[in-house]
Amino acid sequence: MSAIVDIFAREILDSRGNPTVECDVLLESGVMGRAAVPSGASTGQKEALELRDGDKSRYSGKGVLKAVEHVNNQIAQALIGIDASEQSYIDQIMIELDGTENKGNLGANATLAVSMAVARAAAEDAGLPLYRYLGGAGPMSLPVPMMNVINGGEHANNSLNIQEFMIMPVGAKSFREALRCGAEIFHALKKLCDSKGFPTTVGDEGGFAPNLNSHKEALQLMVEATEAAGYKAGEDVLFALDCASSEFYKDGKYHLEAEGRSYTNAEFAEYLESLVNEFPIISIEDGMDENDWEGWKLLTEKLGGKVQLVGDDLFVTNPKILAEGIEKGVANALLVKVNQIGTLSETLKAVDLAKRNRYASVMSHRSGETEDSTIADLAVATNCMQIKTGSLSRSDRMAKYNQLLRIEEELAEAADYPGKAAFYQLGK
């Protein structure tokens, strides 16, 4: 392999027009790896720290020049001369250099930019695509996409508290076919919204953001759009929700403005069960507040045998917190967001821990994205079989889908599309 000879970071803009960190890693062989870091809107309390400048005179305080400086100085000095193939060692050096539990000194946006750029440089130097470099030579699955077609919560300016309403083309025979299915439903939904007088502006993740009267109305729209596109809801396509419940949990209750009601955790679990019974919902993310472990236990006991229950804010891609959740028997799947933990090595450790305990993993973007498509390669490399990367619009979302098309093409007959088998943890 080849040693690192230069590391350089810069401030660029993400899909929301906010600054983020991009990093270039140059090796002595002459190859370069480049990576850019995403940013979330609804964030878990225990996520690794995204370092912002706080200078209100620049980007309303959201600048990342401090993180860039950390990359170009402390991190570069510590890593130059090390072989780029030593990913775990490099990540551990940055963890120790930071010295905090949450990357609070250097910033997770600094460490992650370097970590991903190192992997890209090493893959390029080895003459391998990133998914092969990280995943090895074994069989690989393309992920079933969770396509966010209706946005609510923190991702849209409407009355829906549930943040994401997603379609999953489980009946497709290939990723290419799944992407076509999703695109056709997305365009059918646009026509449907037009016909009902709903605006067809899109939210942060590219889905529509109609001002509906209830969550059931959103789900019914999805059923109608699926059928209008020529597919069967419950057979060809299943639905997934991201409740982002921590955003509407206050004083021990779940407050749904769209429904005009507040619920205890037991009542909210029943409410979610009623949606599952009425609509073909296979996956619910953050169905309870991140600190409501009792609520999570109730929800898991009620729905965990038939519905994928995904911990995002609950686990924040942190192996230690995931281990606690596994021990307590809450949820049955992990949402994987690389910037929640701040290095590739820790991300891969979390996915491995989930697999060993029969928890599914869902590779995920953030609402503030860039054209970086690393998570597409990661989804294939880890065989996690599911990816959540937004709707069928906005080039920051399509970059990931298009990369998966390329990977499927490269793998040819070796590419597997799991469909419903992606939910292997259910009915155990």
UniProtKB/Swiss-Prot annotation:
Query: This protein's superkingdom?
Result: Bacteria
Q: What does this protein do?
A: Catalyzes the reversible conversion of 2-phosphoglycerate (2-PG) into phosphoenolpyruvate (PEP). It is essential for the degradation of carbohydrates via glycolysis.
Required co-factor(s) are:
Mg(2+)
Q: A GO molecular-function term, please?
A: magnesium ion binding
Give the taxonomic lineage as stored in the record: Bacteria, Pseudomonadati, Pseudomonadota, Betaproteobacteria, Neisseriales
Task: Give the residues the record marks as binding (2R)-2-phosphoglycerate.
Answer: 163, 337, 366-367, 388
**Where this protein primarily resides, as one coarse class?**
cytoplasm
User: What's the protein here called?
Assistant: Enolase
Mind telling me which PROSITE patterns this protein's record contains? ENOLASE (PS00164)
One Gene Ontology term of the biological-process aspect is: glycolytic process
What is the species of this protein?
Neisseria meningitidis serogroup C / serotype 2a (strain ATCC 700532 / DSM 15464 / FAM18)
> Which pathway does the UniProt entry assign to this protein?
Carbohydrate degradation; glycolysis; pyruvate from D-glyceraldehyde 3-phosphate: step 4/5
Q: Which EC numbers characterise this protein's activity in its record? A: 4.2.1.11
Q: Name one Pfam family in it.
A: Enolase_N
Localization terms from the record: Cytoplasm; Secreted; Cell surface
The record's NCBIfam families line, in alphabetical order, gives: eno (TIGR01060)
Q: How is the cofactor bound?
A: Binds a second Mg(2+) ion via substrate during catalysis.
| Keyword Nucleotide-binding part of the UniProt annotation | no
- The residues listed in the UniProt record as binding Mg(2+), with positions renumbered to this chain, are 242, 285, 312
Q: Where is the active site?
A: 205 (proton donor), 337 (proton acceptor)
Query: Which keywords label this protein?
Result: Cytoplasm, Glycolysis, Lyase, Magnesium, Metal-binding, Secreted
Q: Which family does it belong to?
A: Belongs to the enolase family.
**What does it catalyze?**
(2R)-2-phosphoglycerate = phosphoenolpyruvate + H2O
